[in-house]
């Protein structure tokens, strides 16, 4: 658990992320949604989906965000496995013999 002071500081930081200088409201919601999905934060995903509806963000934009998170995640996993294969000198072609 956070101390009261830590919680106040966190709350202040979190609130500051909604006071954007460069991102418009719709972009902020889509960035938040993508981060929430990537971090597997179910309450956060729900929050940003509710915000997306309030901002009238179309289903297509939400679908594109979900697809982008999926693509980055899949790419990261592929690179992770490639790195293990390279580090340990594993030849997958030999598995067909």
Where are these regions (language model features)?
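Hydrophobic alpha-helical segments
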Residues: 1-97
